[in-house]
From Swiss-Prot:
Keywords: Cytoplasm, DNA damage, DNA excision, DNA repair, Excision nuclease, SOS response. The gene is uvrC. Interacts with UvrB in an incision complex. Its main location: cytoplasm. It is found in: Cytoplasm. Residues 197-232 form the UVR domain. GO terms for molecular function: DNA binding; excinuclease ABC activity. This is UvrABC system protein C. Residues 15-92 form the GIY-YIG domain.
Amino acid sequence: MSSEHIQNKLALLPDQPGCYLMKDRQGTIIYVGKAKILKNRVRSYFSGTHDSKTQRLVQEIVDFEYIVTSSNVEALLLEINLIKKHDPRFNIRLKDDKTYPFIKITNERHPRLIITRQVKKDKGKYFGPYPNVYAANEVKRILDRLYPLRKCSTLPNKVCLYYHLGQCLAPCVFDVEASKYKEMQDEIVTFLNGGYKTVKNDLMKKMQEAAENMEFEKAGEFRDQINAIETTMEKQKMTMNDFVDRDVFGYAIDKGWMCVQVFFIRQGKLIERDVSQFPFYNDADEDFLTFIGQFYQKANHIPPKEIYLPDDVDSEAVQAVVPDTKIIVPQRGNKKDLVKLAYKNAKIALNEKFMLLERNEERTVGAVERLGEAMGIPTPSRVEAFDNSNIHGTDPVSAMVTFLDGKPSKNDYRKYKIKTVEGPDDYATMREVIRRRYWRVLKEELPMPDLILIDGGKGQIDSAKDVLTNELGLDIPVAGLAKDDKHRTSQLLFGDPLEIVPLERNSQEFYLLQRMQDEVHRFAITFHRQLRSKTGFQSILDGIPGVGPGRKKKLLKHFGSMKKLKEASVEEIKEAGVPLNVAEEVHKHITAFNEKAKNTEQK
């Protein structure tokens, strides 16, 4: 769509709140945003200068749509729904992989107390989140001792051990009044909402009464329950003087990135935090609002009783997203300090991110650039490294790994079974692999490397260059990596005639070469072992009556390795889908093979 068309549409934008949807050449919605004034916000994308990430977004925009709303609040709610519907790739994508555990009282005739990571609208009562399963289990263990709700998912025909331990009322055998369950549930709710001190005081009274009545065993049980409450519920430092559940938000921005920190305060304690980092393309406060809206759309994030927000945030818009929660923008005191702490943590997290990025840049892109300078060639952004692997010439293989801008590109790794070389001949092997690889590159018009690295010396390098130049007509720099007597990367050989490229052994470019050599060696060795394992497996099975290619394949698939087959009984071999008589023959053959190998080792 022409630039003139976009300019015409920009001129028609209204001076009202709403949402806008950016589209690419295929008509796919790639970004959804909201604005208090559509005209100003949308026009800003097509005027002035932008940072690199916003520029990438703008370069892909060929059309846009907009939807006018009656208020900024309505725009936020609409934006959340549009993002959920279209999943635009430039929008914030909150990860769903981190889910926190909750304690749940199930909504059943005979309720249970369970730990779950899924919060559903099923009339159950949920408490949490807890920082981890261990913490949730500790609390549940106390509740199980105090309140004997059923433990079985389905009712058995007779009482279980929990009944004898006093931790179940055995509804499988006895009638339990609904009022009894309600009484226990109310006490559990009180306990989990911060009232555990009341429960603890009641237990202390019961312990004293039992001791006075000479019921020392019962008094000891009450004492253990009190200790469990103290160690589990009171071991965390209090952050607030009450027991209200709160989420505290703080965010920081830098270099086009936003970091949001959320502190989960439950029962007056800071139990966990959630950290999200992402690029933003809108105004920071607008994207922060969008984040909050999406945050509470996730099933495992139940809005608490209160949410604390930093200054300059549209609390009315947030209130529309979580209507049953009290929205607070603290101005002073402990509450303000918590918001500041969330901001401080967000700022630190962003600083760490950029420091790590700089460090990563230094060891990858920077190292590649300096490697090119040291070798006197253009920056080798794409490097393909080769290594051969064989044992006394058996099952010879070769492997190639690819590094793009100093990082492994595993989709571009390749494995080769050597077809034309008999016996251990590294030079001939290198010729075959280079020929096969770059003949295919030419045929399929694949990306050419800027540098080829050979794990070897002059002979391997000359073999590779001969095939490239004289057979394929290619002019690609080829270098060799030599190793010392401890099999560690020692020297980089390059040029005509070959010379040692002077590299500091503690430089990032030298470390990069080490990583390349180690990676291609690992890849080749792994492939060679897989091949040997498969052929070794099949050769041991050769000559066994009733075991042809099909059954060999079946046994290999079932056991996965020779080691497991050697340890298998006749019955276990039969489970692989072979007849009993064949399983007996296989077992007999392998037992004889093992004995022979054992005797050979002893000699």
